[in-house]
């Protein structure tokens, strides 16, 4: 399956070992010029065959690989840089023209109705991209699942709210552009994936950290309709997650006004005319001034979201579908000394509560996991994001000295993830049962 017909035109991919990968498919018009800080617009049809043969630029974000000019870099940042971002082969240029997705499919023809995995990357809503070193679709293709990875606008580019933007919007709102990008990408996949051999009625959205939070947002908005069949939240989505409920409309507008004042722009036209690299520099300076790394977040705006995610779940306003969710042992800086006292990440409790609520509301408890495997090579244990190498099957891309136990766990996790995508169950009942109020079972991944 090297060439596929879509609603926008023909697309040609690259054939690999028994599968085809389509890199850099546009799912929206580039959000540049007058489209900066507007909802994503549909792609115009093209003539001929679009060559989906290379990954595209990442959205504007702080460049953690750049020279820091002598500034002290937090220890955790240097660790994450070594873990994921220091390989030049997987580093990307930055551009506002970044709304692309990638598809790995094992299908040989349209209409095979294979399950679809729709991945949303993490990064605190301010960093990351769709083809990071740890992401790959080969292992999913080998298990009969199509993998889609997407990019979306980040930070200020994806979440700026301001009165100027409210004035030009018919709904008198602004912000949430990154979430709207995710919805546009999901809609594109829903409308086109059957031509790639996928089943549009069996799409599982999943993500880690901000990608998990995004997945929770997508099951909490009416704008995604019936496009989601299942969802997996990894170290992010959960009940009573403050990161999902802390940004109020008033606070978001106030931050937007403060930032725009720092730019010196006197009008929206001036703001949109500013060079992207200059705006990104000002954004990073503003963040340093406020002493907050994550300032620009999705927010309840009355349209994309009418209530926060906790209220959505409590009121039964999330999609009534199968869920799988979990966290890692050392998530959110839980140290070995804390573990000795029995302390777990706040996300752990939130996962249990989520499952109890889905059981209470529609008698369908969720599947909960706890990743406790300590990665070899250093003392970081089961850190935030440690599971990514395993559930993508990309151990060989990592610097760590992985052994037989790691490869066994990798194979197990790929089986759990893809079985859930196929059936709504990660394993047989005797191996992994749902987490119920009367039987709060949690699958240990080690």
Tell what function each PLM region has.
Residues 1-176, 200, 292, 403-413, ...:
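Non-catalytic accessory segments of hydrolases
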Residues 437-446:
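C-terminal domain-tail junction helix/linker
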Residues 82-265, 313-333, 358, 363-364:
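Serine-hydrolase-like catalytic core of hydrolytic proteins
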């Amino acid at each position: 399956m090297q060439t596929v017909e879509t609603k926008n035109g023909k697309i040609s991919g690259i054939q690999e070992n028994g599968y085809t990968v389509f890199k850099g498919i546009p799912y929206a018009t580039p959000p540049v010029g007058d489209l900066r800080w507007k909802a994503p617009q549909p792609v115009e049809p093209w003539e001929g065959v679009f060559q989906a043969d290379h990954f595209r630029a990442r959205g504007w974000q702080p460049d953690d690989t750049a020279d820091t000019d002598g500034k002290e870099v937090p220890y955790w940042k240097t660790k994450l840089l070594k873990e994921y971002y220091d390989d030049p082969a997987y580093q990307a240029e930055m551009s506002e023209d970044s709304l692309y997705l990638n598809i790995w499919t094992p299908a040989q023809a349209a209409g095979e109705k294979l399950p679809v995995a729709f991945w949303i990357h993490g990064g605190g809503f301010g960093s990351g991209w769709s083809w990071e070193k740890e992401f790959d679709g080969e292992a999913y293709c080998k298990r009969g699942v199509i993998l889609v990875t997407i990019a979306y606008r980040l930070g200020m580019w994806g979440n700026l709210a301001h009165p100027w933007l409210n004035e030009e919007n018919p709904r008198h709102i602004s912000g949430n552009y990154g979430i709207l990008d995710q919805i546009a990408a999901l809609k594109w996949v829903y409308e086109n994936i059957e031509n790639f051999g996928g089943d549009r009625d069996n799409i599982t959205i999943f993500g880690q950290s901000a990608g998990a939070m995004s997945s929770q947002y997508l099951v909490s908005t009416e704008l995604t309709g019936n496009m989601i069949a299942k969802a997996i939240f990894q170290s992010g989505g959960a009940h009573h997650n403050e990161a999902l409920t802390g940004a109020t409309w008033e606070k978001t507008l106030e931050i937007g006004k403060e930032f725009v004042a720092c730019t010196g722009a006197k009008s929206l036209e001036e703001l949109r005319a500013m060079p992207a690299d200059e705006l990104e520099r000002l954004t990073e300076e503003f963040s340093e001034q406020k002493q907050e790394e994550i300032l620009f977040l999705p927010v309840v705006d009355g349209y994309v979201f009418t209530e926060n995610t906790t209220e959505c779940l409590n009121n039964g306003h999330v999609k009534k579908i199968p869920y799988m969710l979990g966290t890692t042992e050392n998530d959110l800086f839980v140290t070995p000394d804390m573990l000795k006292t029995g302390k777990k990440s706040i996300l752990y409790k939130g996962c249990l509560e989520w499952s109890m609520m889905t059981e209470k509301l529609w008698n369908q408890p969720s599947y909960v996991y706890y990743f406790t495997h300590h990665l070899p090579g250093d003392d970081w244990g089961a850190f935030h994001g440690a599971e990514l190498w395993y559930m993508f099957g990309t151990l060989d891309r990592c610097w760590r000295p992985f052994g037989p136990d790691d490869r066994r766990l990798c194979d197990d996790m790929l089986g759990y993830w893809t079985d859930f995508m196929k059936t709504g169950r990660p394993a047989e009942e005797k191996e992994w049962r749902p987490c119920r109020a009367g039987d709060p079972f949690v699958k240990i991944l080690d």
